[in-house]
Amino acid sequence: MTAPPRIAFLASPAEPAVAARARLTQRYGDHALDSADIVCALGGDGFMLQTLHRHGAADKPVFGMKLGSVGFLMNQYRDNEDDLLERLQRAEPAYLRPLEMQVQTESGASAGSLAYNEVSLLRQTRQAAHLSVDLNGQTRIAELIGDGVMVATPAGSTAYNYSAHGPILPLGSHTLALTPIAPYRPRRWRGAILKADTEVRFRVLDPYKRPVSVTADSHEIRDVVEVTIRESTQRQVTLLFDPEHNLEERIFSEQFAV
């Protein structure tokens, strides 16, 4: 008989998530992350992203259950906790590769971060950002004027990217969305769909008069002068979903939401 998986339960600080964790650990035990087979994250999408950033390198599959305001990356939490092992056994995997971001700032400092949803550049003041856009070393837009621009993964394409009128990308399509944010010029440019291995470089054309910040998921860096983004070839995380609500179907269904 196969032993049940060892589960590490992680919860957001929200009271419903903390209470759910207490009930689940009483039922299934409380395993440390380094000895667990599966991570169960209790919260919303924000907590799921936090979990991936903090523990993605542990290479443990993550099964999220929604106890927050947004749960696109989560499964539904059910009051009947007795079926969790069956759900884990039936769960379907989704494999996500984050974006790697490298940044140069006005002060000459360098910084880096990962993003599972998107990397977005935004103006810091009332003045529009002026940016150049290079793809694989070739300048494609010499001057983009607007509030900013972003690069989104398929998993993140239904979030901020979609709100900015960017395309929804199928999971496993090996593509990225390049989406302007409130563009003024070029007026007719609405972004592009890129191959996942494309290197994207943004340069801030007037960083002193028109300062720009960059955010990788929730990690913000201000006063940037150059940002380079590429899909990670080293890091991959596995999310687990109930078969009837798998991530691929959710992304597909979003294209028909009214």
UniProtKB/Swiss-Prot annotation:
Binding-site list for NAD(+)? D45, G46, N117, E118, D147, A155, T158, A159, Y160, N161, Y162, S163, A182
Subcellular location field: Cytoplasm
Protein name in the entry: NAD kinase
Q: Gene that codes for this?
A: nadK
A Pfam family it matches: NAD_kinase_C
Q: Which keywords does this chain's UniProt record carry?
A: ATP-binding, Cytoplasm, Kinase, NAD, NADP, Nucleotide-binding, Transferase
| InterPro entries in alphabetical order | ATP-NAD_kinase_N, ATP-NAD_kinase_PpnK-typ_C, NAD/diacylglycerol_kinase_sf, NADK
The record's SUPFAM superfamilies line, in alphabetical order, gives: NAD kinase/diacylglycerol kinase-like (SSF111331)
Source organism per entry reads Xanthomonas euvesicatoria pv. vesicatoria (strain 85-10)
Catalytic reactions of this protein: NAD(+) + ATP = ADP + NADP(+) + H(+)
GO terms of biological process kind: NAD metabolic process; NADP biosynthetic process
Cofactor(s) needed for function = a divalent metal cation
Q: Which NCBIfam families match?
A: PRK04761.1 (NF003406)
What EC class does the entry list? transferase
